[in-house]
Structure formats: structure tokens, C-alpha cells
């Protein structure tokens, strides 16, 4: 099970997450958001993540993957991240390809997460790092999320992504079973419910931000509990 702690704004929270066993540290680069990280802090987080890495960097990891079909591709990605990580993730929303690539160059994040209405066919080939794409499961184009090689991993989130709104897990589990889906799950996860989330069909990773905060600030106890319960 992959664990991603998102919305990290400083190296101290990243340290707690990594020591607890997190595989990915997410940072928000969308301007003007409460969780937007300063570039100087992001560089510190990336440096820390790199110091903990067990193996390949992100581009080496992507190049090492063998073209697969359907769930096999995403299971391969899961195994590679687990054995080589941890990795840093930069989250972007409806920002230009040029802006994203500039931040990649400046901060040297490992993965890009597209969280808006970007054209995946346009963006993914032009971005300089592997891409995690966010989907809302009730979208008509959600089957795009199952296409291997187009992106690193699909992330299923609620329509109000980043606001702690929980998906309909029952419907998602049924849909995933029918389509043999593999995905990261976000939306309303907490230390108290993540043990149920990891049992859903198709879940190979969990992604949390607000669920490990108290009054809008990362809560180290909640981070530790979330990772522990996700990896049980």
C-alpha cells in the first residue's frame, strides 16, 4: 500500500511523514492556496526526500517500467515506488506547461500531479517528470484513468478535491471491481477510516492532506497514526 501525505509546507512535517513510512510527500504549487508551499521550503523537502531514497530517481524509475496493460502497469508502478522511494510530488491545477516545467527545473520535484482540467494528451508528453493524474470517478472520461503508459498513476478524488469530501466508497469499489481498476484514493481520509479504505477493490495507495491536520496545520500525531493504519 502506497501512502502519500499531501499539502506539506515544511521540512519538519515531511520528516515526520517519512520516518513514519510515507512513500510520497505532496506539495501544493497552486498559487494563493492555504497549503501553497514556498519555493525555499519545497527545496528543503525535496532534498530531505532524496536523502531517504532507496533507489532510482523518478525518471530512472519511469524508464525502467515495462509497457503493460491495464492493472499490470499500475501494479508495476506501485512496486517500483515502494522499493525505490520515497518521492516528492508537486501538485498543480490548471497551470501552464511552461510554469510547471519551470518549477520542476527550480525545485527538482520527482512527480507532477495534475489536479485540474488539463488536457492529459497535451500535458503529459511535454512535462519533464512522470505524471499522476486526478480523476473524479463519476466523470464520463474516467476510463482514461485505466490506460497504461499515459501516466504514472491515477488518483481518484471527490469533486471538491482537497476539502476533505469523501467519495462514495461503495460505488467506487463496485466500479473498480468491474473494470479491474488500480488507483490512489483521496477524499475525506483520516487516521480513523483509512483502515477501511485500504480494503476497497483496486486501492493501491492512499492520499491525505486535511485528514492529518488540526486547525489547518499538519498534526504530527495524526500523520503517524494515518501511516501506521494505512500500512497495517
UniProtKB/Swiss-Prot annotation:
GO terms for biological process: L-tryptophan biosynthetic process. This is N-(5'-phosphoribosyl)anthranilate isomerase. Pathway: Amino-acid biosynthesis; L-tryptophan biosynthesis; L-tryptophan from chorismate: step 3/5. InterPro entries: Aldolase_TIM, PRAI_dom, RibuloseP-bd_barrel, TrpF_fam. It is an enzyme of class 5 (isomerase). GO terms for molecular function: phosphoribosylanthranilate isomerase activity. Belongs to the TrpF family. Its EC number is 5.3.1.24. Keywords: Amino-acid biosynthesis, Aromatic amino acid biosynthesis, Isomerase, Tryptophan biosynthesis. It catalyses: N-(5-phospho-beta-D-ribosyl)anthranilate = 1-(2-carboxyphenylamino)-1-deoxy-D-ribulose 5-phosphate.
Amino acid at each position: 500500500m502506497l501512502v502519500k501525505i499531501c499539502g506539506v509546507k515544511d521540512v519538519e512535517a515531511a520528516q515526520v511523514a517519512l520516518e513514519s513510512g510515507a512513500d510520497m510527500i505532496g506539495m501544493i504549487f497552486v498559487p494563493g492556496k492555504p497549503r501553497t508551499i514556498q519555493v525555499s521550503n519545497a527545496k528543503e523537502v525535496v532534498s530531505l526526500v532524496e536523502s531517504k531514497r532507496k533507489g532510482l530517481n523518478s525518471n530512472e524509475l519511469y524508464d525502467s517500467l515495462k509497457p503493460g496493460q491495464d492493472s499490470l502497469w499500475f501494479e508495476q508502478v506501485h512496486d517500483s515506488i515502494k522499493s525505490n522511494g520515497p518521492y516528492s510530488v508537486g501538485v498543480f491545477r490548471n497551470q501552464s506547461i511552461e510554469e510547471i516545467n519551470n518549477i520542476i527545473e527550480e525545485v527538482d520535484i520527482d512527480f507532477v500531479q495534475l489536479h485540474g482540467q488539463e488536457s492529459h494528451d497535451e500535458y503529459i508528453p511535454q512535462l519533464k517528470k512522470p505524471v499522476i493524474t486526478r480523476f473524479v470517478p463519476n466523470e464520463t472520461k474516467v476510463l482514461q484513468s485505466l490506460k497504461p503508459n499515459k501516466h504514472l498513476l491515477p488518483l481518484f478524488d471527490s469533486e471538491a478535491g482537497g476539502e476533505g469530501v469523501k467519495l462514495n466508497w461503495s460505488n467506487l469499489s463496485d466500479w473498480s471491481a468491474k473494470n479491474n481498476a488500480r488507483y490512489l484514493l483521496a477524499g475525506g481520509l483520516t487516521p480513523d477510516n483509512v483502515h477501511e479504505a485500504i480494503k476497497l477493490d483496486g486501492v493501491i495507495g492512499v492520499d491525505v492532506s486535511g485528514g492529518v491536520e488540526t486547525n489547518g496545520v499538519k498534526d504530527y500525531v495524526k500523520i503517524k497514526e494515518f501511516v501506521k493504519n494505512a500500512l497495517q
